[in-house]
Amino acid sequence: MATGFASTGDLAEKKVTFSEIGPDLYAFTAEGDPNSAVIVGDDGCIVFDAQATPAMANKVIERVKAVTDKPIKYVVLSHYHAVRVLGASAYHAQGIVASQETHRLIVERGQQDWDSEYGRFPRLFQDAQSIPGLTWPTLTSR
């Protein structure tokens, strides 16, 4: 007998923290949720992992604006999972950076992963209508 994922019943809000973990290095975390990291550079910021939706990404953006007025120039995607990348459009970044392998996996299974994670993590996708589509890297590396 198959059972559903425990995460489908996880609808309670999580406590979010935004902590400086090093000079100009911040961690956006919530228990059990995807994390984002932020580096504040000389003329802009880099965000690592975008969050599941633009609405969730806006929570990261609010925290970044509380510590700097520098623009978010780049979003780096660590891998292709929907809960980490579909919020990228909210940043209006100069570039979306990912490995060539991440790009390949988005092509191969991005929509399938989105559909799967949407069903498994309803709390993370409460604002799914804000997602304009799959996230495509504009800069790739090996």
Model-found features: residue ranges?
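Conserved beta-strand hairpin/beta-sheet module of binuclear metal-dependent hydrolase folds
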Residues: 18-63
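Short solvent-exposed loop/turn micro-motifs enriched in small/polar/acidic residues
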Residues: 10-12, 30-32, 132-133, 138-140
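Active-site HxH/HxHxD metal-binding segment of metal-dependent hydrolases
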Residues: 62-141
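Hydrophobic small-molecule pocket/channel-lining residues, especially in calycin-type beta-barrels
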Residues: 4-5, 29
